[in-house]
């Protein structure tokens, strides 16, 4: 089934790619000599097939080297082309508006298709460059949650997507950033591993996460990616080799101060209801839930805080719009990013630390969340 979806996705991609190629061709028509128009389409076709094909081969087989490099270049080119078309359309709309107020011949003489193309290229390169920088220079978002005279510093990371195709994630830098915050507790909010555990560099992952320093330890939950490619037993066995405690619809008490509840991802068929996990111990508690749509359940059961990820805030602009529409239609909420408060309850959806597929973030920097949890 997964293979079929990838094949259908590839066909849909290629059809969309041809459409993009046609739009760019129309913009360049006045400057492309007739003899080179066939060459243009040959180049466009080769790029459109080779790069995504390399992406698929590398993703399924984890082949590295030139295959992975070509695939990663393909994602970057695709992002560039998407923005090229987007900016081209915006500039054409601006041009049409100008033509309503300025003599048409003046506008056409001074602003032609080729100039629109050049400006679109500049803007596209700029936003793709910003996206690379945003991924590799994470922000630290500080929030307050809970109530009381005492507090714990809880550092949260979601959607690391370790070993995602083409990933340039540096775990050593990530751990250093975590330790610099001097956390009491560290939480990994799912999609820590991108796909098949057997295909990742286990030694690199284990060595680095075991260097995390926190007063009360490191806790993790599953995301949809871990569960899609691995069984629960495989995930548990892997985490047992680390200093990270995996919570699978479980509750843990931290020094008789607070409780942490870690939920299995929403996609898991046998996931428990939250009220089945909560014990009678009268302590303030927070909920780790990879997908955010069950935040109302946490509110209902009296949680002080819920931390989630999954949405990436769309990762690439303007994909936060269809993501918001999807959540509105499926879960009756527009809430896909940032903080939500109601009474004493606080929920936060992080943009995530890593990236999937496109190794860039044009919708905001990658993120580490530092929670001042009061109890």
Feature map (PLM): residue ranges:
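Non-catalytic terminal accessory segments
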Residues: 1-135
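Hydrophobic alpha-helical transmembrane segments in integral membrane proteins
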Residues: 124-148, 164-169
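Soluble catalytic domains of enzymes that build or remodel membrane lipids, polysaccharides, and related
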Residues: 144-375
């Amino acid at each position: 089934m997964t293979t079929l979806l990838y094949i259908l996705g590839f066909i849909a991609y290629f059809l969309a790619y041809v459409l993009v190629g046609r739009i760019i061709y129309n913009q360049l028509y006045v400057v492309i000599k007739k003899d080179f128009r066939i060459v243009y389409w040959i180049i466009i076709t080769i790029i459109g097939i080779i790069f995504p094909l390399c992406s698929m081969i590398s993703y399924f087989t984890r082949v590295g080297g030139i295959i992975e490099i070509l695939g990663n270049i393909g994602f970057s080119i695709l992002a560039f082309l998407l923005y090229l078309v987007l900016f081209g359309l915006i500039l054409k709309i601006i041009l049409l508006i100008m033509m309503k107020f300025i003599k048409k011949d003046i506008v056409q003489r001074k602003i032609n298709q080729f100039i629109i193309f050049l400006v679109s290229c500049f803007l596209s390169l700029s936003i793709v460059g910003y996206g690379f920088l945003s991924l590799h220079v994470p922000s630290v978002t500080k929030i307050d949650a809970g109530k009381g005279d005492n507090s714990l510093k809880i550092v949260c990371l979601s959607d690391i997507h370790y070993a995602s195709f083409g990933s340039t994630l540096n775990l050593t830098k990530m751990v250093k950033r975590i330790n610099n915050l001097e956390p009491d507790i560290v939480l990994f909010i799912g999609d820590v591993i991108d796909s098949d555990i057997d295909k990742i560099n286990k030694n690199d992952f284990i060595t680095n996460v075991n260097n995390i320093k926190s007063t009360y330890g490191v806790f993790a939950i599953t995301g949809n990616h871990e569960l899609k490619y691995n069984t629960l037993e495989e995930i548990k066995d892997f985490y047992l080799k680390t200093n990270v405690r995996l919570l699978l619809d479980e509750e843990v008490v931290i020094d008789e101060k607070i409780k942490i509840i870690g939920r299995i991802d929403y996609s898991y068929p046998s996931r428990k209801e939250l009220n089945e996990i909560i014990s009678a111990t009268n302590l303030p508690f927070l909920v780790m839930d990879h997908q955010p749509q069950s935040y109302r359940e946490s509110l209902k059961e009296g949680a002080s805080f819920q931390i989630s990820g999954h949405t990436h805030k769309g990762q690439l602009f303007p994909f936060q719009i269809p993501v918001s529409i999807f959540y509105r239609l499926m879960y009756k909420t527009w809430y896909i990013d940032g903080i939500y408060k109601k009474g004493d309850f606080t929920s936060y959806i992080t943009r995530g630390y890593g990236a999937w597929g496109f190794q860039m973030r044009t919708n905001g920097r990658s993120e580490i969340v530092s929670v001042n949890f009061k109890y």
